[in-house]
Amino acid sequence: MTNIRKTHPLAKIINNSFIDLPTPPNISAWWNFGSLLGICLILQILTGLFLAMHYTPDTTTAFSSVTHICRDVNYGWIIRYMHANGASMFFICLYMHMGRGLYYGSYTFTETWNIGIILLFTIMATAFMGYVLPWGQMSFWGATVITNLLSAVPYVGDDLVQWIWGGFSIDKATLTRFFALHFILPFVALALAAVHLLFLHETGSNNPSGIPSDSDKIPFHPYYTIKDILGALLLILTLMLLVLFSPDLLGDPDNYTPANPLSTPPHIKPEWYFLFAYAILRSIPNKLGGVLALILSILILAIIPLLHTSSQRGMMFRPISQCLFWLLVADLLTLTWIGGQPVEHPYIIIGQLASILYFTILLVLMPITSIIENNILKW
């Protein structure tokens, strides 16, 4: 009798995705982040669901409802901090996952890569709206600054901003719709993640060497299930260390002050995982130019497959490209640091140089380096 997991219509899908899936034998720990992202997403949906049971999306009670969750609800504090720090872990895994894709040339699976970019935008939108919900000072002013950027759109900008606000300023209508969208978008992300996997399983996984491994595959279970469990344990350990020892390490103290439209915080800044994009936005003095640079800083990923000029897939055997990749990582860390600094000398010029370098590496230096490396290999 054939095993039920291979015949049952539903079990068959799970079997072909997580059990009998042919997998390259040499994929490293950098391939763990996909499963970790899945765990993060499920964790965020579950903790978010329990938070939504006690949260009230109303400008007068939102802040106190979050306080109530932390003080009065059974284990409310741990749920709240797991949700807040879970978002940070989510973005750490996301950036690692994308870095792996860039380094090893996984972007040559264009459908998988493009779905990934849409997923990134979805999760960034979700995280931004989630930051608004506690209705602290940084929630309110962060939302004001970011939504105001849409007024840079020619002709329809102001109408667009008022349409999103649901009025002439950020108020009850804005908070309510942000809560509704913050609740629904993770489920959209879940569906997109399924499509992401669907396209990935059409081609099979890439591997560190970049050489096709069709002739040499091993089953996903037990080899990679056990490896993923190790990754998951390390993820949960890191998250719980953060939650239990320094839950406010990555947050902003200003968000413990209830939102006040009459008092602007001295430094308005988003959560740490958006600081690199915020630095790029601020590095351009023109409003529309800044907004375009902000969007392009992420959308640039979509043209990476078109700029792939190397005869090799990954960077494993390309030392010059490796140097450029790590320069890009250092540049992004610099941008993250600059995004959290006040707009004054020398931070302005450092931010502008780092922004120029970011686009130069991706658009100019990497394709040229690949061509040079191709020619070196011909000798």
From Swiss-Prot:
**Taxonomy, superkingdom:** Eukaryota
Chain residues that bind heme b b566: 97, 196
Q: Which GO terms describe its cellular component?
A: mitochondrial inner membrane; respiratory chain complex III
Q: Which membrane topology describes this protein?
A: Multi-pass membrane protein
Which sites bind a ubiquinone?
201
List this protein's GO terms for biological process: mitochondrial electron transport, ubiquinol to cytochrome c
Name the UniProt key words of this record, in alphabetical order: Electron transport, Heme, Iron, Membrane, Metal-binding, Mitochondrion, Mitochondrion inner membrane, Respiratory chain, Transmembrane, Transmembrane helix, Transport, Ubiquinone
- What's an example of a GO molecular-function annotation for this chain? ubiquinol-cytochrome-c reductase activity
- Required co-factors: heme b
The family line of this record is: Belongs to the cytochrome b family.
Q: What does this protein do?
A: Component of the ubiquinol-cytochrome c reductase complex (complex III or cytochrome b-c1 complex) that is part of the mitochondrial respiratory chain. The b-c1 complex mediates electron transfer from ubiquinol to cytochrome c. Contributes to the generation of a proton gradient across the mitochondrial membrane that is then used for ATP synthesis.
UniProt miscellaneous comment: Heme 1 (or BL or b562) is low-potential and absorbs at about 562 nm, and heme 2 (or BH or b566) is high-potential and absorbs at about 566 nm.
Stated name of the protein: Cytochrome b
Name the gene behind this protein. MT-CYB
